[in-house]
Amino acid sequence: MDWSEEGVVLGVRRQGENNVVLELLTRDHGRHLGLVRGGRGRRLRPVLQTGNIVDAAWRGRLAEHLGTFTVEALEMNAARIMDDPARLSGLMTMATHARLLPEREPHHRLYDAFRIVLNQMNTEEIWPTLLVRWELGLLEELGFGLDLGKCAATGSTVDLIYVSPKSGKAVSADAGAPYKSKLFALPAFVTGRSADEPTGQDIFDGFRLTGFFLEKHLYGPRGIDLPDSRAALLTRLSETG
């Protein structure tokens, strides 16, 4: 069994003296692991950094085996991201989230969106909003998507400014006003309702919304906490915003 495909490096773990087990996110083969011989060596170590794009060839005797990867660098994203603490925290947050995906199950839209966030990480005013939307996409891909198209109480499609923590559904301004202290804010950029540039508060409201549902549906049931890198990201954004 063998295949070749581009993939995003999610991380590695040491295997013996010189080898590593590489974890990739690929478009057609999903989250996939494989042994890289010499992965701790001088040539490959810089290549196998989280966020880099590699051309990977996987080979195994049987499809269910761990198998081996041979890799070549395509995009060395880690070098341009690691010098900025906020971008680095954002990258590590995405990589940690991606490890929640079932192995070897393709998620094309989520992979494509991951690449878009990576490509935009030098654009300070864009990438945090894209990361919020990527987290929403992760929830949707794993069966916990939010219903943000109409008001849960009235069916209205206008003035949707809240989200119910119980149902994950949007709530309009009028219907939510008596309960607004118990509802999450729904920033306009999340649903594309406004062309205005999101404020710092909008971005924090977006991360607060996604963080609640990530913990509720994905992290909490697994008995694990949201990534430390995500908390660090919010701290960094507050310092710069």
PLM features per residue range, with description:
Residues 1-21, 25-241:
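Non-catalytic alpha-helical scaffolds and adjoining flexible linkers that form interface surfaces
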